């Protein structure tokens, strides 16, 4: 649960991590260098927002699983300037493409990392598109130092603690805030709650969220998977049935 005690613990752990990294690389921590890096990352994140806007309107030629793979590569880029340049070109190429007309879902829960794209690929084959995803990385595409940049590391710790929507926290208000924001912004036809086997903490908020989804008349399906491929046929059947349900609800809304 998020409170002053857990926040101070997080700050202490981050401080220890910074000291360890500084010893390892042989460089001292500098608040001005941190702020310069944050400003650089904020420029990249602005492009990420533009990319997301363009990609969500170009799903006929650039499926959701490719959008997710591009976002994953942000954390793996060895040359951020080169990565940023490629993303700007991709964003420009996607602008103006035809939007996707089929049912669209919001993917929530256990993070889906490349190459474990079993569910995103099955969704695409079933004619269902991913309009957005919410997991422990969601808040990391926002500006790092939106407030009090002069405080350096403390501002960094405060930002990530306050914006952490992962299931590590019970009664996570940030998760609910992210869900409300994405539902309003992406207007999904349904919700897929993804849980990797063993990660039961991702179920902690499901009951609470289901009440909100019911209020918004959004059907929900919980999919539990692992890294094996033996369950693909079962997942395919359930996903196709869920896609038909969303399509039927769409028709009912259009005739209402």
Outline where the language-model segments fall.
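A short, charged helix-loop
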Residues: 1-5, 16
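Redox- and metal-dependent alpha/beta enzyme cores, enriched for Fe-S-associated oxidoreductases
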Residues: 110-171, 175-182
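Peripheral docking tails and interdomain loops at the edges
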Residues: 204-256
């Amino acid at each position: 649960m998020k409170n002053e005690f857990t926040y101070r613990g997080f700050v202490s752990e981050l401080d220890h991590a910074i000291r360890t990294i500084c010893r390892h690389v042989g460089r001292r921590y500098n608040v001005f260098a941190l702020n310069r890096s944050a400003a650089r990352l904020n420029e990249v994140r602005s492009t990420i927002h533009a990319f997301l806007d363009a990609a969500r309107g170009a799903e006929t030629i650039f499926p959701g699983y490719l959008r997710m793979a591009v976002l994953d590569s942000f954390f793996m880029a060895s040359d951020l300037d080169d990565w940023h340049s490629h993303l700007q070109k991709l964003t420009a190429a996607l602008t103006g493409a035809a939007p996707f007309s089929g049912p669209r879902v919001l993917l929530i829960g256990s993070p889906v990392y490349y190459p474990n794209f079993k569910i995103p690929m099955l969704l695409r084959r079933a004619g269902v598109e991913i309009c957005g995803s919410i997991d422990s990385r969601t808040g990391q595409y926002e500006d790092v130092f939106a407030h009090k940049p002069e405080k350096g590391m403390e501002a960094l710790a405060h930002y990530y603690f306050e914006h952490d929507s992962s299931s590590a926290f019970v009664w996570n208000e940030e998760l609910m805030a992210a869900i409300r924001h994405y539902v309003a912004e992406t207007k999904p036809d349904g919700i897929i709650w993804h849980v990797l086997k063993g990660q039961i903490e991702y179920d902690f908020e499901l009951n609470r969220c289901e009440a909100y989804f019911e209020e918004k008349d959004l059907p929900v399906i919980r999919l539990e998977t692992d890294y094996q491929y033996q369950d693909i046929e079962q997942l395919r059947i359930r996903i196709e049935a869920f896609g038909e349900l969303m399509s039927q609800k769409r028709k009912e809304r259009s005739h209402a």
